[in-house]
C-alpha cells in the first residue's frame, strides 16, 4: 500500500479506547465490565475483613487477570531463612516463575519481629500465559507451599491506564512501535553510510522502537542471532544528544525516521539469568540489562590483549556512528496514527520533523579504509591531530585514502596547521578535494616557558574522543621531562557524553563489561597513530574525575623510569596511599624558579590524639613576598598558600611577626604531618594563594541549618533580597556595582565587571560589559533555582590555617556550651570603588558569633558555631580563617572531617542564620581506617591499576548524596529529617565514600537506603516526585516563578551592538600598533575557540568569567566546580600568554626604552589599538549579518582599559 505525504499529514490524532471495534474482541462491553467489577468489590470486602494486612482480592478461578497488560501477585508464607546471606532471597522466586512469563518487578518484605514467614510481590508484564497458581492458589518452591494472591488494586490501575494501538502500545509516557528495520551509520556528504544494523553483517530477528518521554530517551530493542544463539540488545539515545530536526521519508508501504546524534548510544545486553537477585530484596527487570561496549554474544569476551584504538576494524563500529535510521511498515491507518502520535509528542521536546530523503551510500571496503590510520609514513603529531579530527566527526575515515595522500604532500608544519584549523573551525570537511589542502591558512602555535601543551583524550564505552592539545601550567613531572612533553597524555574515562562519569555504586554489577574495557585500557594502553600510551599515574583530583596520566614509552624513557624519578615510596604499604603520594607530583603548580628556601621541620601540635596543625606550616615574609611577585597577585600579599615541595604538601601561612627568628631569610617551616614521602626535589611550587570570596548557602547547608532550628523565612528573605537587588541593578550603575562587590566569586569575575561599570563602559553601551552583566544575572538565577546557591553578604569562603600563637580559645568537651574562637580579617571590597583594579584594598575584622562549615556537609554536627574575635597577635593574617590550636579537639576535623592542607571553609556572621541547636555532636570515626594491601607476586603498579578500576566501580559518592537529599526532605517517610537514622547513616556512609580515594575501602549503599520518592527541587520523574515544603523547596519554586515573571530571557542571549567607545580615541600612538593587534588577535581567537570547543561552551563571555551555563539536561550531572576551575585555569593561562605576547610584539615589554610618561601613553595606545581592531571586525561582521566575531581580546587588559576610561572621563569633565 503506497503512502503519500498528504495521507500522513491528514492523520487525525486520536486515542484508542476500549470502545474501539477491534478492542471489543478483547474486552467486555462497559456494562458487563462494571458488573464484573461489582463482584470484585464484594470479594475484596470479604477478604479485607478476613485479613487486615492485605486488602486485595484473592481470585482463584476468575479470568479477569488476563485483561490487563500487567498483573501483580502477592506471594505469602515465604520462610525467613530465604533472607539470610546464603538463603537465595528473590532468586528463589525468579528461577521457577520466569518460565511462565516476563517478570517486571519483585520485592520481598522484611518480616516483623518474631515472624517465621514473610511476603513478596511479583509483577508480570504482560500477564503469564497460564495461571500457574490454580486450582488451589498455591505454588511449591523448594519444597515449600506458598500462597498466591492477585493484587486487584494494582491490577485495576493498570487496566484503566491502557492505551492500545493495533500493532503497538502508546501513552503519554511511553511509545512502543515494531520496526521493519533499523540502521546505524555515518552522515557522509548528505548521504548515509550504514555501518551497523539490518543488512550490515548482523542478523536481526526482531526489533522495536521504545520512546520514554518521561526519561527523554528513545531505545532500539532488537534480537541478534549469533550461530543459532539469540541475544537481546538495547541501544539508548538521550533526547539531548539528538541534533536538529527528525528527518522523515516516505516510500511505498514504509516510512523512515532519521535521527542525527552527537554521542554514541548506550549499549545494553539482556542477561538470561537474574543471578544478582540472590543477594537482593528488591529487583526489577532493568537489572537484567548489562552495559556493553559492543554487540557480541554473552560467551564472547570483547576485550583483547591489544591497546584501545579509535578505529576498531574487528567489531561493529557503533562508536563511529552519528545517525540512526528507523523504518516502519505501514499496513493500515493505525500504523500511520502511531507514527503521527510519536512525531507529535517529540515536538513537545523541540524535536520537530521535516522531509529528509534517505539516500544510502555503501562503502564495502570500510574496514580497509580504517586500517589506513596506522600508516607509518605519517608523523606522530600529525597522526594525533588527524585522529582528533576523526573523533569529532570533522573528518571521516571514509576519506582516509585522499586525506593521507594529500597530507603526505604537505610539509610537517603545514599539515599540522591544516588539521588544527579544522579542529578550531568546528566545520566538517567531508569528501575533500586536493584544493582544500592547498588553501592559504595561518595558525599560531601557543607555547611559553610557563605553559606546556599536553595531549588529552576521553575514553568512552564505544569510542575515543581526542581533543587538541590541552594547555597546561605544568606540574613537577612534565616540567622535568619537558623534552618529552608531547609523549604525555591526560586520559579521562567517561560515559558516552564525555562530561558524565560512568556510574558506579549500586550499578556496578551491571557495568562489568565496561570495567573490563577500563582494565584493557590500563593493561595495554591506548594506540594513537603508531604510538602506544601506557598508564603512568594519577593525582587525587584526577582519580575523583576518573582520570590518569599516560605516557608513550620508548627506548630513551619509559613510564617506570618516570615513576622512579618521582620519589621513594617504598615505606608506603597501602595501595591507595601509594597512588596518592605519586599523584602529589602531578598537582598543577607554579614553580618558583631560582629561589632557594631553607627548610626547618616542625612538630605538629597534637592533643588527645587530635592534630591541630594537620597539613599546615609556616613561611617567612620574604617567601610570601617573592611568591606574590611570581604569581602576579594584584591583591595584597597573600597570608597563606597551598604548596608542593619534594614530598611535602599542604599549606604554608605567614609566620607571626613577633617570632623574629622565623623571618631571618627565605625560610619555610613544614610540619611532620606534611611530610608524605622522600624526594630529592626541593623547589617550592604553588597551587593556589589565599583570596577572599563571598559565602554561599547550598542545598545541603540550608537543609542542615533548617533542621538545626533556623526559620525557613530567613532563607527566603536572603533569596528575595539577592534577586530583587539584581532586578534593581538593571537600571542603576551604583546598585550594579554594589551588587557585584557584595557577591565576589572565587575567580573575582564580579569585581572585574564592577570595575568596567564603574569606569563607565556600561553607560556608554559597551557590548562586552553588557553581555557580562546579562550572563551574570542568568548564571545566578540558574544556580539559585537548580542548586539553591544563595549568596550571603555577611559571610566569606576562606582558606583555613592554624593559630601559631596559641591565643585563640579552642573547643573543650567538658564545657557546658563550648563556643571556640576564630579570627577573620577580610578584604572590604565595598569601601572603595575601583579598588580592585588599582590594588588599593582595605580590610576589616569580623567580631561576633559565626557558623563555620565545609563542603560537603551532611551531618548535623558538621555545622559549628564559633565566636569571631579581634586578636592583635593575628593581625598579619588576612583573607583566611584562623582556627585555634588549643582545646580538646580540632575544629576543622569536626567540619565533615576537614583539615588544613588546602581545605576552604564557609564562615557566616549573619545572626539570622545562627542555629537554635548549637554544636550538635560531630560525626566521629566508628572504626579505624582500613587500607588495601598490594597484590602478591605482581608489580606494584598492577595494584594501583586494580585500585583505579575498583574506585570507578564502587564510586558511590553521588548516589549517597542524592539519597540523603531525598530522605532529608521526605518527612512522610522520615519524620525526623536530618536527625533520622537513615540520614545519619547516609551521612556516615558519605564520609567513608569521600575517604575512599585515600583509604581504598569502598562504601556500598544497600538497597534499603534508596529513596522512596524525591522532592520536586531534584527534578526527577513526576511519578516519584513530591512537593517539598522545606526551605529548599520554597526557594526552588520562588526562583522558578521569578524567572517566569521577571521578564528576563529564560536562557542567556548575547547582545551585539556597534557603538564605538569615544574613550578609545585619545591615545596618540594607536596607529603604530594596529597591525600587531590584528595579528595577535587572530591567534588569540583561534585558541579561545579551541577552549570553547573543548569544553562545549557556547560563548566567549562564559570562558572569560567562568560563569558557565550548562544545558538543562546536563546541569545536574556535570561536575560544575571542577569544570569551572579547569576553564578558569585554561583562560588564565591564555590571558597571561597573550597579554605578554602582545606587549612583546609592540616592543613594550621593557619599560627602560622610554621615559615613564611616554611608556604609559604607549601602553594605553597599544590597548586602544586592540579595541579598534576588534570594533572594526565587529562592525564588518554585523554588516554581513553574522555575529561570530570574538570581541574579548581588548578586555584581557581590563585594568588598563579602566585606567584609559577614567582618564578620558576626567579629561572630558575638565572641559
UniProtKB/Swiss-Prot annotation:
A GO BP annotation = silent mating-type cassette heterochromatin formation
Asked if Glycoprotein is a keyword of the record, the answer is: no
Under Gene Ontology molecular function, one entry of this record is: RNA-directed RNA polymerase activity
| Keywords on record | Centromere, Chromosome, Chromosome partition, Cytoplasm, Nucleotidyltransferase, Nucleus, RNA-binding, RNA-directed RNA polymerase, RNA-mediated gene silencing, Telomere, Transferase
A Gene Ontology term for the protein's cellular component? chromosome, subtelomeric region
Q: What is its EC number?
A: 2.7.7.48
Q: Establish whether keyword Transmembrane is in the entry.
A: no
Record's subcellular location:
Cytoplasm; Nucleus; Chromosome, Telomere; Chromosome, Centromere
Q: What does this chain do?
A: Has a role in the RNA interference (RNAi) pathway which is important for heterochromatin formation, accurate chromosome segregation, centromere cohesion and telomere function during mitosis and meiosis. Required for both post-transcriptional and transcriptional gene silencing. Required for silencing at the centromeres and for initiation of transcriptionally silent heterochromatin at the mating type locus. Promotes histone H3 'Lys-10' methylation necessary for centromere function. Required for recruitment of swi6 and cohesin to an ectopic dg repeat.
Q: How does it assemble?
A: Cid12, hrr1 and rdp1 interact forming the RNA-directed RNA polymerase complex (RDRC). The RDRC complex interacts with the RITS complex via interaction between ago1 and hrr1. Clr4 has a role in mediating this interaction.
Q: Which family does it belong to?
A: Belongs to the RdRP family.
State the protein's name.
RNA-dependent RNA polymerase 1
Native organism: Schizosaccharomyces pombe (strain 972 / ATCC 24843)
Amino acid at each position: 500500500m503506497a503512502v503519500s505525504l498528504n495521507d500522513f499529514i491528514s492523520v487525525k490524532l486520536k486515542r484508542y479506547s476500549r470502545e474501539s471495534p477491534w478492542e471489543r474482541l478483547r474486552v467486555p462491553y462497559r456494562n458487563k465490565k462494571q458488573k464484573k467489577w461489582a463482584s470484585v468489590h464484594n470479594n475484596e470486602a470479604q477478604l479485607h475483613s478476613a485479613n487486615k494486612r492485605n486488602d486485595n482480592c484473592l481470585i482463584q478461578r476468575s479470568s479477569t487477570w488476563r485483561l490487563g497488560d500487567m498483573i501483580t501477585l502477592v506471594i505469602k508464607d515465604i520462610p525467613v531463612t530465604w533472607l539470610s546471606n546464603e538463603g537465595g532471597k528473590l532468586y528463589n522466586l525468579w528461577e521457577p516463575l520466569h518460565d511462565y512469563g516476563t517478570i517486571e518487578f519483585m520485592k520481598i518484605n522484611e518480616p516483623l519481629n518474631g515472624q517465621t514467614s514473610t511476603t513478596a510481590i511479583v509483577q508480570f508484564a504482560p500477564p503469564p500465559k497460564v495461571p500457574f497458581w490454580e486450582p488451589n492458589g498455591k505454588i511449591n518452591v523448594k519444597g515449600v507451599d506458598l500462597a498466591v494472591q492477585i493484587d486487584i488494586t494494582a491490577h485495576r490501575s493498570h487496566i484503566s491506564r491502557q492505551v492500545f494501538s493495533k500493532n503497538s502500545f502508546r501513552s503519554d509516557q511511553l511509545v512502543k512501535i515494531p520496526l521493519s528495520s533499523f540502521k546505524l551509520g555515518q552522515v557522509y556528504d548528505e548521504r548515509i553510510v550504514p555501518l551497523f544494523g539490518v543488512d550490515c553483517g548482523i542478523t536481526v530477528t526482531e526489533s522495536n522502537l521504545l520512546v520514554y518521554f518521561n526519561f527523554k530517551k528513545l531505545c532500539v530493542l532488537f534480537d541478534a542471532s549469533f550461530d543459532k544463539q539469540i541475544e537481546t540488545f538495547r541501544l539508548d539515545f538521550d533526547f539531548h544528544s539528538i541534533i536538529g530536526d527528525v528527518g522523515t521519508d516516505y516510500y511505498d508501504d514504509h516510512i523512515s525516521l532519521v535521527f542525527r546524534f552527537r554521542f554514541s548510544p548506550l549499549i545494553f545486553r539482556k542477561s538470561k539469568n537474574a543471578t544478582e537477585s540472590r543477594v537482593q530484596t528488591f529487583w526489577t527487570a532493568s537489572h537484567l540489562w548489562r552495559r556493553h561496549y559492543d554487540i557480541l554474544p554473552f560467551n564472547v569476551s570483547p576485550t583483547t590483549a591489544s591497546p584501545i584504538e579509535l578505529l576498531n576494524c574487528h567489531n561493529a563500529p557503533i562508536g563511529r556512528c552519528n545517525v540512526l535510521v528507523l523504518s516502519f511498515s505501514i499496513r493500515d491507518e493505525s500504523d500511520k496514527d502511531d507514527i503521527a502520535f510519536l512525531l507529535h509528542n517529540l515536538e513537545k521536546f523541540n524535536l520537530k520533523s521535516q522531509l529528509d530523503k534517505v539516500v544510502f551510500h555503501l562503502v564495502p571496503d570500510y574496514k580497509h579504509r580504517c586500517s589506513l590510520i596506522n600508516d607509518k609514513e605519517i608523523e606522530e603529531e600529525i597522526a594525533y591531530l588527524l585522529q582528533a579530527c576523526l573523533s569529532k566527526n570533522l573528518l571521516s575515515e571514509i576519506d582516509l585514502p585522499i586525506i593521507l595522500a594529500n597530507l603526505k604532500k604537505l610539509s610537517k608544519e603545514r599539515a599540522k596547521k591544516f588539521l588544527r584549523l579544522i579542529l578550531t573551525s568546528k566545520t566538517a570537511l567531508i569528501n575533500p578535494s586536493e584544493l582544500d589542502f592547498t588553501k592559504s591558512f595561518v595558525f599560531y602555535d601557543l607555547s611559553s616557558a610557563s605553559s606546556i601543551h599536553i595531549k588529552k583524550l576521553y575514553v568512552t564505552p564505544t569510542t575515543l574522543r581526542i581533543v587538541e592539545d590541552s594547555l597546561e601550567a605544568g606540574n613537577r613531572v612534565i616540567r622535568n621531562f619537558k623534552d618529552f612533553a608531547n609523549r604525555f597524555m591526560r586520559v579521562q574515562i567517561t560515559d558516552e557524553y564525555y562530561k558524565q562519569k560512568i556510574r558506579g555504586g549500586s550499578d556496578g554489577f551491571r557495568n562489568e563489561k565496561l570495567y573490563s574495557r577500563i582494565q584493557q585500557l590500563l593493561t595495554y594502553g591506548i594506540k594513537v597513530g603508531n604510538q602506544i600510551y601506557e598508564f603512568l599515574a594519577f593525582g587525587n583530583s584526577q582519580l575523583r574525575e576518573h582520570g590518569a596520566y599516560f605516557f608513550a614509552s620508548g627506548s630513551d624513557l619509559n613510564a617506570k623510569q618516570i615513576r622512579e624519578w618521582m620519589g621513594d615510596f617504598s615505606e608506603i604499604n597501602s595501595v591507595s596511599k601509594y597512588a596518592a603520594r605519586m599523584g602529589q607530583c602531578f598537582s598543577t603548580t607554579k614553580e618558583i624558579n631560582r629561589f632557594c628556601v631553607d627548610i626547618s621541620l616542625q612538630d605538629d601540635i597534637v592533643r588527645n590524639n587530635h592534630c591541630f596543625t594537620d597539613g599546615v606550616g609556616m613561611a617567612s615574609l620574604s617567601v610570601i613576598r617573592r611568591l606574590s611577585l611570581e604569581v602576579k597577585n594584584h591583591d595584597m600579599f597573600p597570608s597563606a598558600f597551598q604548596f608542593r615541595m619534594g614530598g611535602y604538601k599542604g599549606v604554608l601561612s605567614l609566620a607571626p611577626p613577633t617570632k623574629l627568628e622565623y623571618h631571618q631569610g627565605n625560610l619555610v617551616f613544614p610540619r611532620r604531618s606534611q611530610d608524605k614521602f622522600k624526594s630529592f626535589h626541593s623547589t617550592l611550587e604553588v597551587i593556589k594563594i589565599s583570596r577572599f570570596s563571598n559565602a554561599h548557602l547550598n542545598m545541603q547547608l540550608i537543609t542542615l541549618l533548617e533542621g538545626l532550628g533556623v526559620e525557613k523565612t530567613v532563607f527566603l528573605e536572603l533569596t528575595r533580597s539577592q534577586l530583587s537587588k539584581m532586578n534593581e541593578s538593571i537600571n542603576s550603575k551604583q546598585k550594579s556595582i554594589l551588587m557585584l562587590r557584595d557577591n565576589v566569586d572565587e575567580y573575582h569575575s564580579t569585581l572585574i565587571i564592577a570595575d568596567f561599570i564603574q569606569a563607565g563602559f556600561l553607560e556608554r553601551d559597551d557590548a562586552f560589559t553588557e553581555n557580562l552583566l546579562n550572563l551574570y544575572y542568568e548564571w545566578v538565577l540558574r544556580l539559585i533555582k537548580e542548586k539553591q546557591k544563595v549568596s550571603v553578604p555577611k559571610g566569606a569562603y576562606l582558606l583555613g590555617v592554624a593559630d601559631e600563637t596559641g591565643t585563640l580559645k579552642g573547643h573543650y568537651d567538658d564545657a557546658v556550651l563550648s563556643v571556640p574562637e576564630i579570627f577573620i580579617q577580610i578584604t572590604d571590597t565595598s569601601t572603595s570603588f575601583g579598588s580592585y583594579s588599582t590594588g588599593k584594598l582595605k580590610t576589616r575584622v569580623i567580631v561576633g558569633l559565626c557558623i563555620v562549615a565545609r563542603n560537603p556537609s551532611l551531618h548535623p554536627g558538621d555545622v559549628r558555631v564559633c565566636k569571631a574575635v579581634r586578636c592583635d597577635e593575628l593581625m598579619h593574617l588576612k583573607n583566611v580563617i584562623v582556627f585555634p590550636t588549643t582545646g580538646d579537639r580540632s575544629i576543622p576535623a569536626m567540619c565533615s572531617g576537614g583539615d588544613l592542607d588546602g581545605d576552604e571553609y564557609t564562615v557566616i556572621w549573619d545572626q539570622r542564620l545562627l542555629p537554635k541547636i548549637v554544636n550538635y555532636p560531630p560525626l566521629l570515626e566508628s572504626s579505624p581506617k582500613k587500607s588495601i594491601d598490594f597484590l602478591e607476586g605482581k608489580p606494584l603498579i598492577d595494584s594501583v591499576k586494580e585500585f583505579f578500576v575498583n574506585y570507578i566501580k564502587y564510586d558511590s559518592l553521588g548516589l549517597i548524596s542524592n539519597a540523603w537529599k531525598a530522605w532529608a526532605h521526605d518527612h512522610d517517610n522520615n519524620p525526623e529529617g536530618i536527625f533520622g537514622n537513615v540520614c545519619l547513616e547516609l551521612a556516615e556512609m558519605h564520609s567513608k565514600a569521600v575517604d575512599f580515594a585515600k583509604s581504598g575501602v569502598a562504601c556500598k549503599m544497600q538497597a534499603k537506603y534508596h529513596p522512596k520518592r524525591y522532592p520536586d527541587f531534584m527534578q526527577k520523574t513526576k511519578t516519584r516526585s513530591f512537593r517539598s515544603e522545606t526551605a529548599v523547596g520554597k526557594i526552588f519554586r520562588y526562583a522558578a516563578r521569578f524567572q517566569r515573571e521577571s521578564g528576563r530571557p529564560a536562557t542567556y542571549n548575547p547582545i551585539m551592538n556597534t557603538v564605538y567607545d569615544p574613550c578609545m580615541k585619545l591615545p596618540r600612538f594607536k596607529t603604530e600598533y594596529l597591525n600587531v593587534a590584528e595579528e595577535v588577535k587572530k591567534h588569540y581567537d583561534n585558541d579561545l575557540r579551541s577552549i570553547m570547543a573543548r569544553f562545549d561552551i557556547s560563548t566567549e563571555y562564559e570562558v572569560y568569567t567562568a560563569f558557565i551555563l550548562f544545558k538543562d539536561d546536563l546541569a545536574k550531572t556535570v561536575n560544575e566546580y571542577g569544570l569551572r576551575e579547569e576553564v578558569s585555569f585554561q583562560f588564565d593561562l591564555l590571558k597571561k600568554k597573550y597579554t605578554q605576547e602582545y606587549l612583546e610584539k609592540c616592543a613594550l615589554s621593557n619599560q627602560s626604552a622610554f621615559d615613564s610618561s611616554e611608556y604609559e601613553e604607549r601602553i594605553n595606545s597599544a590597548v586602544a589599538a586592540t579595541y579598534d581592531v576588534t570594533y572594526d571586525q565587529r562592525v564588518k561582521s554585523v554588516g554581513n549579518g553574522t555575529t561570530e566575531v570574538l570581541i574579548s581580546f581588548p578586555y584581557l587588559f581590563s585594568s588598563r582599559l579602566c585606567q584609559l576610561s577614567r582618564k578620558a572621563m576626567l579629561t572630558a569633565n575638565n572641559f
